[in-house]
Amino acid sequence: MRLCIPQVLLALFLSMLTAPGEGSRRRATQARDTTQPALLRLSDHLLANYKKGVRPVRDWRKPTTVSIDVIMYAILNVDEKNQVLTTYIWYRQYWTDEFLQWTPEDFDNVTKLSIPTDSIWVPDILINEFVDVGKSPNIPYVYVHHRGEVQNYKPLQLVTACSLDIYNFPFDVQNCSLTFTSWLHTIQDINITLWRSPEEVRSDKSIFINQGEWELLEVFPQFKEFSIDISNSYAEMKFYVIIRRRPLFYAVSLLLPSIFLMVVDIVGFCLPPDSGERVSFKITLLLGYSVFLIIVSDTLPATAIGTPLIGVYFVVCMALLVISLAETIFIVRLVHKQDLQRPVPDWLRHLVLDRIAWILCLGEQPMAHRPPATFQANKTDDCSGSDLLPAMGNHCSHVGGPQDLEKTPRGRGSPLPPPREASLAVRGLLQELSSIRHFLEKRDEMREVARDWLRVGYVLDRLLFRIYLLAVLAYSITLVTLWSIWHYS
């Protein structure tokens, strides 16, 4: 007992000697803490023992909920050939980090702090449709609130795959999706929700640049839980970006020139079919339309899986021009046969000049009445045979007989030639007159045949013109109706 008392006294003495040193060190530490900025002290406090490789929850059974938001800023490019959409968006996301919480009163009432993104845990949320790295600005910081809420704001240039349907070009509406999902974590680890309500996301066009070729209709969000196998399920948030092309430029540069050329082709039917000007006019028009298609070929979207309807429209217009040229060649050939032309058959005369002319309200097309060819030939032969003179008074009274010769002044005032010489002279004269009459009748007959074929050609030309006009109008009305439905639906 006597030995313990000195030991106790020695311990008390030593504690009295060391107490002033420890107090001075504690006071020095407190002085140093108050001299440092609050943000620096808070950053050191939060990141001193932080492990960014671990999901920031105290209970591993609790999932980390990540709320995301997308605001469309601009449509930069729509590549129909490669099926790629380039957009510029404002992307926002926030989650709760349970390891980044503090009491604001301990740090000069600081409620939020910006810290480097590389220093903390960040969810691995990616876009499934990524096909290329966009030129997005780098934002290296995030905001952390005292309750552990982490806010990550950043603009993104997205180059994503999109199934583009160009059949309705230039009145097409495209629906492209942006699918945000965790590449590794299942829904038991990371769950995805919307930052704002779906109605606010759909109607938000506040920052969209609405001066380009494309018009933003809406951004429709949809949550979906999918699974690759039975045990693992993943959360994804899909944003459907619905855009519509402004068709005014393409209507002016593509549709109007084609419509003008087709109207000129229709007006070309006013040229008379018996002139050669219509054929050269149609050929020039067809050549001009071919040059027009070569010029606009680079403007049309080209894909390997489909052709726009406007491309079909151009091909059909080209086919109609070819049909119009073929019809013109047929009519010109029909009315220009002339000497080689046979008389119009009775069935064709009845069909075209009676029936079709009446249907087209062209009035009755008169046909020249010609006696049969056999009658004319027999009549000519009666006046040129060897028995001409004996029968002259009966069958050739239209030329004149010997009695008429006797009544002439020459016959009364001069002696008559011998009967033999008179008969030869009359025979030669009658043969010449018969040849002249035969030539004139043949010429008149050929002219009447040509006129008949010309009438047939005019009627067929009117018929084919109206059929062609109906085909052009029906095709144009169908396309305009379809494009109007697609544009205003």
UniProtKB/Swiss-Prot annotation:
Tissue: Brain, spinal cord, and heart.
The keyword Chaperone appears for this protein: no
Membrane topology field: Multi-pass membrane protein
GO MF annotation, one: ligand-gated monoatomic ion channel activity involved in regulation of presynaptic membrane potential
Residue ranges that the UniProt entry lists as topological domain Cytoplasmic: 274-278, 327-466
Catalytic activity, as annotated: Na(+)(in) = Na(+)(out); K(+)(in) = K(+)(out); Ca(2+)(in) = Ca(2+)(out); Mg(2+)(in) = Mg(2+)(out)
Compartments where found: Postsynaptic cell membrane; Cell membrane
Gene3D superfamilies for this protein: Neurotransmitter-gated ion-channel ligand-binding domain, Neurotransmitter-gated ion-channel transmembrane domain
Transmembrane segment boundaries: 247-273, 279-297, 308-326, 467-486
Predominant cellular place of this UniProt entry's protein: membrane
Region annotation HA-stretch: where it falls in the sequence: 425-461
Topological domains, Extracellular: 24-246, 298-307, 487-489
Subunit field text: Forms homopentameric as well as heteropentameric serotonin-activated cation-selective channel complexes with HTR3B or HTR3C or HTR3D or HTR3E. The homomeric complex is functional but exhibits low conductance with modified voltage dependence, and decreased agonist and antagonist affinity. Heteropentameric complexes display properties which resemble that of neuronal serotonin-activated channels in vivo. Interacts with RIC3.
Family: Belongs to the ligand-gated ion channel (TC 1.A.9) family. 5-hydroxytryptamine receptor (TC 1.A.9.2) subfamily. HTR3A sub-subfamily.
Free-text comment on this protein's domains from its UniProt entry: The HA-stretch region of HTR3A seems to be responsible for the low conductance of HTR3A homomers compared to that of HTR3A/HTR3B heteromers.
Protein name per Swiss-Prot or TrEMBL: 5-hydroxytryptamine receptor 3A
Source organism of this protein record: Mus musculus (Mouse)
Gene responsible for this protein: Htr3a
